[in-house]
């Protein structure tokens, strides 16, 4: 009851409206501009980095480039609403844990190198997904939204009779449902609310 009273007293305040927009309405993506020239085989000024580090993890370099485009629009100075920085939008804590010195998150090579390392580690967390193309979908979702939310969606998929090792029409459906209270409060979920529409 106390929460309801607080809500009723604050629902029209500027701070409440700003929080609602930040967490529930605004897109968290950085607006996209143009890329260089796909027909000429040039996606960005960082193609050499994508090629180098994608090879180390066994990915097509264009997939790594598309992840960077989605995350930062190839802007090395980008900083997200949540504090993620640089070309690959590394969270500072993740960057530190992966060996990036403080202040170097926006260095393109550091960013791509650490992102590739993180993607490789994340892929190991989904090793039970045997099809490598299917596993990549889970890895990309975890990169964007966090492994915990993907694990929650997998648990929900299993609970509701879907295949927890298949993304399309299975786990992807439950990543979206994690924005609904009955799902994010389900006992199989450990990581709470997740909007999911950008994952």
Predicted regions and their residues:
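Substrate-binding/active-site groove segments that recognize
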Residues: 77-103, 110-121
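Catalytic and substrate-binding regions of cell-wall glycan-acting enzymes that process beta-1,4-linked
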Residues: 134-199
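Extended ligand-binding regions for polar small-molecule ligands
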Residues: 1-28, 41-44
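Export/targeting segments at the very N-terminus of extracytoplasmic proteins
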Residues: 26-73, 112, 126-130
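Generic alpha-helical structural context detector
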Residues: 65-69, 88-92, 141, 152
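Periplasmic-binding protein-like
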Residues: 1-5, 27-32, 175-182
